[in-house]
Amino acid sequence: MKKRNVLALALALVMSVGMSSSVFAATWSGNAPKENDVEKVTYNFMNETKAGKYKLVDTDTLKGWVDNKDKMIVVDTMPAAASYNKQHVPGAINSVAPMTEKEYTADQKADLMKQVKPLLSKKTVKKTTWTKVSKKTYKKLKKSNRKTKKSKKKVYYYKKVVKKYVVADKNTKIVVYCGHIGCARSHVAAAYLVKQGYTNVYRYGGGISAWVDAGNAVDKVETPSA
C-alpha cells in the first residue's frame, strides 16, 4: 500500500473514531483529541504498518467480509474480561497481545498459534519428479499440455505427480484488531503473524471501538450468573 494511502486510511480511522471520547480514553483526556495528538497517532500508525508489513482493512470492508461470510480468521487481541467477553466482532477468537513487541511473551505467541493453525484453510500440494519417457510419449504428453522438457542430448521427460498431500494454507485471510487506532496490540500480533510466514494478514486499525461506533452487531461471551 502506498504511503499516501496509508496516511489517508489512518486519518480516516482517527477521525471516524474520534467522535467517541471512550475510544481515546487511554491516549487522551477530554472530549476531542488535539491536532498534534492526532498527528502523532497517525504517523505512529503509519510507521507500525510499514514495519509490520501487513495490510490494512477499514470498517466498511471488514463489515462486508463478515456479512459475506468470507473465509477468514478474525483475532481480537484485547483482554478477555475487560473487552472481548463484553463485545467483539462476530466470529472473532481471542488471543491477548501486549502493547509492545518486547512484552509479547512466548506463552502469548503460542496461544495465538494454537488458535490460528486449526482454523487455516487447507490446500493440496503436489510432489512431482521429472520422469524419463520415449520421444513418442513425450510428443503425446506435450500435445495434451502436460509439463515436459527435452535435454540437449535429446532425452525426454515429463513432470509426474508422485504424491499429493494437504497442508495448511498460510495465505488464509487473517484480520487482527484491538481497541482503537491508538492501540498497538493489533500491530504486535499482526507483525508476529507476518514474521511466521502468513502472507494475507490485515490489521483493522479502528478496532472494536470503530466497529461499535459504526453500529455493527457484536458477539459477547455469556457468563453464568452467580
Give the predicted meaning of each segment:
Residues 79-83, 99-102, 180-184, 207-211, ...:
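Solvent-exposed loop/turn segments at secondary-structure junctions
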Residues 77-126, 167:
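Mid-length scaffold segments of soluble, non-membrane domains
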Residues 131-150, 157:
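Extended amphipathic alpha-helical heptad-repeat regions
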Residues 1-9:
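Bacterial N-terminal signal peptides that target proteins for export
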Residues 16-88, 222-226:
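Flexible, polar/low-complexity N-terminal or interdomain linker segments that lie immediately upstream
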Residues 46-53, 99-106, 162, 179-181, ...:
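Second-shell loop/turn segments in exported
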Residues 49, 66-69, 81-82, 96, ...:
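Sec/Tat-exported extracytoplasmic proteins
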Residues 110-134, 158-210:
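Catalytic cysteine-centered active loop of the rhodanese-like fold, especially the PTP/DSP P-loop
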